Amino acid sequence: MKSSTQAVLEHTAIPKHIAVIMDGNGRWAKKRFLPRIMGHKRGLDALENMVKHCAKLGVQYLTVFAFSTENWRRPEDEVSFLMGLFLQALQKQVRRLHENNMRLKILGSRERFNRQILQGIEEAEALTANNTGLTLSIAADYGGRWDILQAANKLIAEGVSEITEDTLAKHLMLGDAPEPDLFIRTGGETRISNFLLWQMAYAELYFTDILWPDFDGKALDDAVASFQKRERRFGRTSEQLPIEQQRN
């Protein structure tokens, strides 16, 4: 049976692109007197459910922050486990994505990944490259400032004499995707932590105290419902918006 929230969502605008910082895995485990790595394992399960629910709602792009450039500073055993979990997801979950016509992209620097992970990334992206369903982008060893810098360096290398917003945007890691409409951060923190700094200029921000492993379909429905109540003006006045976009 559909919830009342789901019924409303089906008849109103769904964000085309959702970006998520999946925060709270460690605290979820700590509350249960479990090692932090167990929180990360449950976090992977939550991501699987998120992908399914986004596809069900009609979301076209889902971009998640899995591992930042700053996360290399974490304890060595935790970083090692996260890399292993990342490889496991690439090897096992990509088949499921492919079977459901979903595309997988990995965003970020690849300089510090080992050969096995690099091979896994290349194979996963190649397998799903021609799929036309939801695009799942996983930001790993990624930072928003790094993204802008690498785009600028590409333009310099190409000999571009004048950098415009359009040319820079096309050289970012998400250059072939629309900018996020909705940004969600779980775990109670209220910052964007160097994630998609350029691309989220006009995203609607949604923060929740729910820890990532507990973020389920209902929680996503609530986030989307909040998005739908907002009036996105992009610098214009309410009166300049089409009637259907104006908030009563």
Curated annotation (Swiss-Prot):
Catalytic machinery residues: D23, N71
Question: Hey, what's the signal peptide range on this chain?
Answer: none
Q: Where does Mg(2+) bind?
A: D23, E204
Q: Which superkingdom?
A: Bacteria
The UniProt record lists the EC number as 2.5.1.-
**Residues annotated to bind substrate:** 24-28, 36, 40, 68-70, 72, 74, 185, 191-193
Q: Which GO terms describe its molecular function?
A: ditrans,polycis-undecaprenyl-diphosphate synthase [(2E,6E)-farnesyl-diphosphate specific] activity; magnesium ion binding
The note on the cofactor says: Binds 2 magnesium ions per subunit.
Q: Name one Pfam family in it.
A: Prenyltransf
Query: Which key words tag this protein in UniProt?
Result: Magnesium, Metal-binding, Transferase
Q: What class of enzyme is it?
A: transferase
Q: Which biological process terms from the Gene Ontology are attached to this UniProt entry?
A: polyprenol biosynthetic process
In terms of PROSITE patterns, this protein maps to:
UPP_SYNTHASE
Per its UniProt record, the required cofactor names are: Mg(2+)
Task: Quote the cellular component terms of the Gene Ontology held in the record.
Answer: cytosol
Q: What's the subunit arrangement here?
A: Homodimer.
Give the function comment from the record. Catalyzes the condensation of isopentenyl diphosphate (IPP) with allylic pyrophosphates generating different type of terpenoids.
* Family statement: Belongs to the UPP synthase family.
Q: What is this protein called?
A: Isoprenyl transferase
Source organism per entry reads: Neisseria meningitidis serogroup B (strain ATCC BAA-335 / MC58)
